[in-house]
Amino acid sequence: SAASDVYKRQEEILQKVLKLASDNGLKLRGHTLVWHSQTPEWFFHKDYNVDKSLVSKDVMRQRMESYIKKVLTYCQENYPGVVYAWDVVNEAVNDDGTMRTSSNWYKVYGDAGYVTDAFTFARKYADKDVKLFLNDYNEYAAAKRDRIYQVVKDLYDKGLCDGVGMQSHYSMTSPTIAAVKVAIQKYNQIDPGKIEIQLTELDIHNTFRTAADQKSVATKYQSLFNMLVDSRRNQKINITGVTFWGLTDGDSWLSDFKGETSYPLLFGADYAAKSAYFAVLNAAK
């Protein structure tokens, strides 16, 4: 069936990535189990056929559990210890602070109960030291931030979620580092010093081609990391990871997404370290 073919293809992709990580002593964040985007439309329909109606909530729950079980079991049995965290649910909240009702997951369930189910199944099948995150973008904007806080708090209080994944797709003007700091402090209130906070998809969009102009990007990176280091060292906020959304500017998703060449990362398309790289190192000292 279409479903079993997809599982097989996914295993092939997973195997390549997990082997690369394992061979090189690298750890992976798993991204992402439940998302409105890039989940095939047929996954939500009867007989996996888009011409048929959406399945019932009970059938959807069974499919979700089967899928999460398969993915986590495959990773853990074949490459134990490589995946240290999962973004269990990605982008469940709208910018205005409401839940994303346009998601097929929401449509089938009729409510946001799919979020709790996803975390319940992830907790059930994940090894005990694997951390589970709710991940989202514009996570520093007040209305959205406050809803993410509430969703994560409810999950965390049930023992289902370990932390907040802050995607951290920034531009040169937005957000301010102060706004990011306020969001981190807000999320920390869920369980001060214990709840994990990670920046999961960090990049800073800009179109500055020259090394001289790139210095302003480096300055923003340095301000950000100074704040993160201070939050962790001096305020004892449990910031446990920063993941950049790509290695070099040449591989960044942003150029395609923005329709203009972006230079958002720590290394240039030529793999040379940029001033932003040294700025991050300086902040870590």
Regions found by a protein language model. Give the residues of each.
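Short, small-residue-biased leader/transition segments that mark boundaries at the very start
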Residues: S1-Y7
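Aromatic-lined carbohydrate-binding surfaces of glycoside hydrolases
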Residues: S4, L28-D47, N90-D96
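Aromatic-rich peripheral "rim/lid" segments of glycoside hydrolase catalytic domains that contact
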Residues: E12, Y74-E77, G81, D87-A112, ...
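An active-site-proximal structural segment forming one wall of the substrate-binding cleft
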Residues: V17-N24, N49-V88, A112-F121, Q150-Y156, ...
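Hydrophobic faces of well-ordered beta-strands that scaffold small-molecule active sites
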Residues: L28-T32, Y84-V88, L132-L134, D162-M166, ...
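Active-site-proximal loop/turn and secondary-structure-junction residues that shape catalytic pockets
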Residues: V34-H36, N90-N94, D136-Y140, S168-M172, ...
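Aromatic- and acidic-residue-enriched carbohydrate-binding clefts of CAZyme catalytic domains
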Residues: E41-K57, D96-W105
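Distinct, well-ordered alpha-helical segments
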Residues: T98-T101, A118, A141-D157, T176-I184
